[in-house]
């Protein structure tokens, strides 16, 4: 019996020692994580300036001296702790081109603002109940540069797109790549084409002065020109009250279905990111316009369920020599109901595409 009690006491002592050792090991691991800087917040991104210049002297093939510069930033902020994930992305760029000519020497070449944030609660591994909000617009006036008068085709808040939605987000990391797929059946979208009275009056006068100076072809002159109406017509912020009457508004509000997919991959000094965003409104085609609109058959102007707004962005960057960077950025857009004028002056719904390849000073972190 004495031997049994002695053995039992030894087992108890062994268990206590083992438990203390495990506790010490876990505490050491936690301390090591803390010392290694495993934090809830993570901030990374890419900023830079691309530039190019062309100089010509007695160049038989023709051309003009020009300088082009684009400043850009892609910033990403992530908070992830326990079951909470909060992610914010800010993408922006602005570019100007100087051309050696008397008229319109400075022309805007790029202009973009995109801010998106989403807050999620992880209810199952890699699955999040998420609230998402985003905004996109531009900084400065956009003009259609051509001979004579250059009409205004866009500005700050004309257009702008604001999205708010609630949905499910699947997030996964694998081999250096972060994947996200978000689907929301409860999504709101507000599209604006806003211009204040003072700015509207100013640019209406500019149009009339350009006509008086002979800069506008008389066959294309509109005596009732109004910039606000032009922009609201282009971006579809109006509503038909009957087959021939439009009620113009500063904004269009829609409720619908949205999808967003994203991939971000980093390998040493190489970075790739791409996002695809889709939205379709919960509404029908509307009533027949009986041919009163040359572009659309029905009153909802092709903005009905099954017709998707498309935004697809791709960004590639490679950093070398610590401060030099090669970048390629593309953006493809398609918005049903948005009319775009081509070189011949014809209006139609069109796929929009922008590609920028540059080399310049940049920094990734």
Language-model features: locations:
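Transmembrane beta-strands of outer-membrane beta-barrel pores
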Residues: 49-55, 81-83, 92-98, 135-141, ...
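Residue-level signature of outer-membrane beta-barrel architecture
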Residues: 75-81, 117, 121, 133, ...
């Amino acid at each position: 019996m004495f031997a049994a009690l002695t053995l039992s006491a030894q087992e108890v002592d062994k268990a206590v020692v083992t438990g203390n050792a495990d506790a010490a090991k876990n505490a050491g691991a936690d301390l090591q994580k803390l010392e290694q800087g495993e934090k809830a917040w993570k901030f990374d991104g890419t900023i830079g300036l691309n530039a190019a210049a062309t100089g010509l002297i007695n160049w038989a093939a023709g051309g003009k001296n020009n300088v082009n510069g684009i400043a850009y930033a892609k910033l990403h902020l992530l908070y992830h702790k326990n079951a909470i994930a909060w992610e914010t992305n800010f993408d922006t760029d602005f570019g100007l081109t100087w051309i050696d000519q008397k008229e319109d020497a400075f022309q805007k070449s790029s202009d973009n603002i995109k801010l998106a944030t989403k807050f999620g609660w992880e209810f199952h591994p890699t699955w999040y109940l998420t609230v998402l909000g985003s905004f996109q617009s531009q900084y400065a006036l956009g003009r259609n540069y051509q001979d004579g008068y250059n009409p205004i085709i866009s500005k700050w808040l004309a257009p702008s797109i604001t999205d708010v939605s609630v949905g499910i987000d699947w997030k996964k990391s694998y081999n250096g790549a972060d994947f996200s797929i978000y689907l929301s059946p409860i999504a709101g979208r507000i599209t604006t084409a806003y211009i204040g009275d003072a700015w509207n009056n100013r640019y209406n006068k500019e149009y009339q002065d350009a006509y008086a100076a002979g800069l506008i072809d008389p066959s294309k002159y509109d005596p009732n020109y109004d910039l606000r109406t032009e922009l609201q017509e282009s971006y579809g912020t109006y509503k038909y009250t009957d087959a021939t009457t439009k009620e113009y508004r500063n904004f269009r509000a829609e409720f619908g279905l949205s999808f967003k997919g994203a991939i971000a991959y980093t390998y040493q000094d190489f970075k790739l990111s791409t996002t695809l965003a889709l939205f379709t409104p919960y509404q029908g085609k509307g009533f027949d316009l009986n041919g009163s609109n040359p572009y659309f058959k029905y009153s909802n102007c092709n903005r009905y369920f099954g017709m998707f707004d498309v935004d697809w962005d791709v960004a590639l960057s490679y950093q070398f020599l610590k401060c030099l960077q090669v970048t390629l950025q593309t953006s493809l857009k398609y918005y049903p109901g948005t009319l775009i004028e081509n070189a011949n002056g014809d209006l139609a719904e069109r796929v929009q595409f922008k590609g920028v390849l540059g080399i310049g000073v940049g920094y990734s972190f």
